């Protein structure tokens, strides 16, 4: 599917991988990496981060691979590294999340900053105190976009940063 020119084939490939994600194993990560880097755009990459996340959640020994991806030259690998724990809720590895986000602070790239914000926002539904503390500790290095997205569900805390966001 990823060799075909039309985007619809990549969508079909992502849908298929999502359907079989529980069958995938660490040995599939190199091929997934190739898919992430093939005709990359947010719509397919964001589907693949769930597939990668499923593998990492079942095989924690793969976490170092995501740390490697978090510093890659390829923004799409970095985006998957940042967002692969979306939906993990209380199973989120905060040490890994923090390290991956810290590897991507002070970025100008929209897709990286948006991913950081989404990752923080998603986890704030489970642990708003952790997200508040993280944003407070790194507010000078996070983009306004990341802060705005990440603080969306943390209540009045968000008001503290509105002056910087506007």
PLM-predicted stretches and their roles:
Residues 1-166:
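Alpha-helical scaffold domains
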């Amino acid at each position: 599917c990823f060799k075909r020119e039309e985007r619809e084939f990549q969508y079909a490939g992502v849908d298929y991988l999502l359907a079989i994600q529980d069958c995938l194993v660490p040995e599939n990560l190199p091929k997934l990496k190739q898919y992430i880097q093939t005709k990359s755009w947010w719509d397919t990459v964001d589907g693949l981060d769930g597939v990668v996340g499923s593998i990492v959640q079942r095989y924690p020994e793969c976490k170092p691979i995501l740390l490697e991806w978090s510093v890659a030259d390829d923004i799409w690998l970095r985006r998957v590294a940042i967002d692969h724990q979306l939906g993990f809720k209380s199973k989120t590895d905060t040490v890994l999340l923090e390290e991956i986000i810290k590897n991507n602070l002070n970025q100008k790239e929209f897709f990286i900053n948006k991913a950081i914000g989404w990752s923080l926002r998603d986890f704030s539904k489970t642990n708003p105190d952790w997200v508040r503390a993280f944003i407070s500790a790194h507010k000078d290095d996070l983009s306004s976009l990341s802060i705005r997205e990440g603080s969306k569900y943390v209540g009045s805390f968000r008001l503290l940063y509105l002056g910087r966001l506007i």
